[in-house]
């Protein structure tokens, strides 16, 4: 739960911009080129523009935002994108109300508050590794907090590795003229994660408190080879094959988690 600071009486509107960014990875092993292609097709179907639109619509509802516009696109050969413009003010039908009644907040926020997702399925050309990456950004202006959607997004996608960044920018001014650069308490993104999520993931923080920048990386603690095999079961593989595949997968996870290639 996002705990606000003691209520401030503001001069005008709350102009703080809060942005939450996710990189979510699903890692898989597919033995043949045909299996890797089927994995790409499976992921592309599982996370097409329609499914992603539903996920982002749910996010808007969770954070208490109103949807202004939705743009979505599936790509050839694979991948999809969805962008939703949001506001914290109710949407007023122009046909039922004069233009002068349309909330200024709605108009002002159309280029600031948004939720976007882009997907990137890909495969290794030789080693059988296939990955799916989803980049998600939730940016809000005002009192709406994107942190409320943390757990839902992690649970909605096949999240082997999650890289999260949260930052607060701008300021809001109170009636005495004093500027406030953040309006809620936060020490780490981890404090907003549900217990069942935290119990499943190994987590690491890099935070710059004075700049209101918070960064958390996490990957699954438990490694179950069957969860990473596509169209195959570990029991059908020889011990040597299992060890080879497990080594490849753990290396891939480690490299994605740290964001750099490991030495041979």
Swiss-Prot record:
It catalyses: S-adenosyl-L-methionine + H(+) = S-adenosyl 3-(methylsulfanyl)propylamine + CO2. Keywords: Autocatalytic cleavage, Decarboxylase, Lyase, Polyamine biosynthesis, Pyruvate, S-adenosyl-L-methionine, Schiff base, Spermidine biosynthesis, Zymogen. Coiled coil: none annotated. The active site is at 113 (schiff-base intermediate with substrate), 118 (proton acceptor), 141 (proton donor). It is an enzyme of class 4 (lyase). GO terms for biological process: spermidine biosynthetic process. Is synthesized initially as an inactive proenzyme. Formation of the active enzyme involves a self-maturation process in which the active site pyruvoyl group is generated from an internal serine residue via an autocatalytic post-translational modification. Two non-identical subunits are generated from the proenzyme in this reaction, and the pyruvate is formed at the N-terminus of the alpha chain, which is derived from the carboxyl end of the proenzyme. It comes from the Bacteria. Pathway: Amine and polyamine biosynthesis; S-adenosylmethioninamine biosynthesis; S-adenosylmethioninamine from S-adenosyl-L-methionine: step 1/1. One of its GO terms (molecular function) is adenosylmethionine decarboxylase activity. Its cofactor is pyruvate. The record marks 112-113 as: Cleavage (non-hydrolytic). Its EC number is 4.1.1.50. Binds 1 pyruvoyl group covalently per subunit. The modification Pyruvic acid (Ser) is found at residue 113. One of its GO terms (cellular component) is cytosol. HAMAP family: AdoMetDC_2. Belongs to the prokaryotic AdoMetDC family. Type 2 subfamily. Catalyzes the decarboxylation of S-adenosylmethionine to S-adenosylmethioninamine (dcAdoMet), the propylamine donor required for the synthesis of the polyamines spermine and spermidine from the diamine putrescine. Heterooctamer of four alpha and four beta chains arranged as a tetramer of alpha/beta heterodimers. This is S-adenosylmethionine decarboxylase proenzyme.
